[in-house]
Amino acid sequence: MKNRYIQQFEDAQLKDKSMPTFKAGDTLRLGITIKEGEKTRTQYFEGVCIAIRGNGVDKTFCVRKIGANNIGVEKIFPFYSESLASVEVLRVGRVRRAKLYYLRDRRGKAARIKEVRH
């Protein structure tokens, strides 16, 4: 159980943050702010959300994409990170699991996720 003062501080931190709702299986496009010296730029990372864990300020999510030479790249982001400039849900996936770690072993068409029909 957390101290009530810590809980009040965390609630105040979360009030002014807004994130789109997404779940494991959704394809996301993340804008990450990168500071290089005096300049700042936004780099985009697009992939499938394979896990969401934690709650409150400690909540994180893991995004996986297939990079150059068919090498899988996974990045874990804090949900309320200052470095996340934008989060956009591109596709809503239909999966039956909360953690999609089995996608690490799949290649090509076997790694596809069905899309939710509207």
UniProtKB/Swiss-Prot annotation:
PANTHER family: LARGE RIBOSOMAL SUBUNIT PROTEIN BL19M (PTHR15680:SF9), RIBOSOMAL PROTEIN L19 (PTHR15680). This protein is located at the 30S-50S ribosomal subunit interface and may play a role in the structure and function of the aminoacyl-tRNA binding site. It comes from Helicobacter pylori (strain J99 / ATCC 700824). One of its GO terms (cellular component) is cytosolic large ribosomal subunit. This is Large ribosomal subunit protein bL19. GO terms for molecular function: structural constituent of ribosome. SUPFAM superfamilies: Translation proteins SH3-like domain. Gene3D superfamilies: 2.30.30.790. GO terms for biological process: translation. It holds the Pfam family Ribosomal_L19. The keyword Ribosomal protein applies. Keywords: Ribonucleoprotein, Ribosomal protein. InterPro entries: Ribosomal_bL19, Ribosomal_bL19_CS, Ribosomal_bL19_sf, Translation_prot_SH3-like_sf. Belongs to the bacterial ribosomal protein bL19 family. Coiled coil: none annotated.
